Every structure is written in C-alpha cells, then in structure tokens.
Amino acid sequence: MTIAFQLAVFALIATSSILLISVPVVFASPDGWLSNKNIVFSGTSLWIGLVFLVGILNSLIS
C-alpha cells in the first residue's frame, strides 16, 4: 500500500510540474487556448483525481 501511495504522490508532483509549465504557455500563445483547451481540461481533471487519490491513500496508510 505504501508503494501505491508513493507512486500517487510522485504522479501528483509530476502532473503539477507539467501543468505549471504548460498552462501559461497555452495562454501566452496566440491560438493556444482554442487548440489546446481539451488537453488543459484533461490535465486539470487528472490533477484533481490525483489529489483525491492521494488523500484517500493517505487516510488508509495513517
């Protein structure tokens, strides 16, 4: 169970880092938002899901 928690935390950190870089780039590009809107929403949904997963796994471990 601990390894699943560690992998979920790593995935959350990696997703946060990717979104931290990609979202401002998408908003700064001229046609970026219209062409990459679905990717940003998918990344945000993944991040929210990982936050809940880490919270659930943390409650099971502690």
UniProtKB/Swiss-Prot annotation:
Q: Which GO terms describe its biological process?
A: photosynthesis; photosystem II stabilization
Q: Does the keyword Thylakoid apply?
A: yes
Q: Which SUPFAM superfamilies match?
A: PsbZ-like (SSF161055)
Pfam families the record matches: Ycf9
GO annotations of cellular component type = chloroplast thylakoid membrane; photosystem II reaction center
In the bilayer, the protein is annotated as: Multi-pass membrane protein
The residues forming a coiled coil are none
Keywords of the record: Chloroplast, Membrane, Photosynthesis, Photosystem II, Plastid, Reaction center, Thylakoid, Transmembrane, Transmembrane helix
Supply the InterPro entries for this chain.
PSII_PsbZ, PSII_PsbZ_sf
Could you list the residue ranges that cross the membrane? 8-28, 41-61
Highest rank taxon of the organism: Eukaryota
Q: Write down the Gene3D superfamilies for this protein, in alphabetical order.
A: Photosystem II PsbZ, reaction centre (1.10.287.740)
Is the keyword Transmembrane assigned to this protein?
Answer: yes
Protein task: May control the interaction of photosystem II (PSII) cores with the light-harvesting antenna, regulates electron flow through the 2 photosystem reaction centers. PSII is a light-driven water plastoquinone oxidoreductase, using light energy to abstract electrons from H(2)O, generating a proton gradient subsequently used for ATP formation.
PANTHER family linked: PHOTOSYSTEM II REACTION CENTER PROTEIN Z
Its assembly, as annotated, is: PSII is composed of 1 copy each of membrane proteins PsbA, PsbB, PsbC, PsbD, PsbE, PsbF, PsbH, PsbI, PsbJ, PsbK, PsbL, PsbM, PsbT, PsbY, PsbZ, Psb30/Ycf12, at least 3 peripheral proteins of the oxygen-evolving complex and a large number of cofactors. It forms dimeric complexes.
Q: What is this protein called?
A: Photosystem II reaction center protein Z
**Organism from which the protein derives:** Gossypium hirsutum (Upland cotton)
